[in-house]
Amino acid sequence: CKFLHGNNIVNFTRTDTRLAFEKLSDTLHISLNNATVSRMDVAYNFDVTYPPESYFYHLGNLPYYKRLEQMFYKGVEGLYYSSVSDKKQLVFYDKIKETTNRKDYVPPEYQNKNLLRYELRLKNHIKQIFKVNKVTVPMLYDVRFYNRIVDYWKSEYRKIVKQNEYEIDITD
């Protein structure tokens, strides 16, 4: 996202994925059409009403994952779910705070917003997760495969036990 838009706050689309890989391919002067994808991070920034950390307490356990609250001196800053095998990780955090702490650019339209980031990190075994022989770069922006990725991202969130009947709307 930062490579294409100059910041890591704007939500990335399927078209952005294609454009980013085309730009990378042009920059490196090599074709990435046969490149194998070995890691995938799927994320979205939700504009929420309250500070993002206030939502963490509504997210309970996730079967076969360790639930870890990332703590700082000001309280809970992030929520991590790491699979027992450490092949997958679900992460929730305040995207504006994270960007500001890294001293990265926050576009004016996002300043003073509550952006809750939900990120699914697939560290390996991507082809097994999606039941394909190989995941290549062009598959990431193929409409059917892209929709499978998004559906998987949603399904992983839905497996989290919700507490106090509150749920983040991920239907967009």
For each of these PLM feature ranges, what is it?
Residues 1-171:
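Structured, helix-rich domain cores that form ligand/interaction pockets
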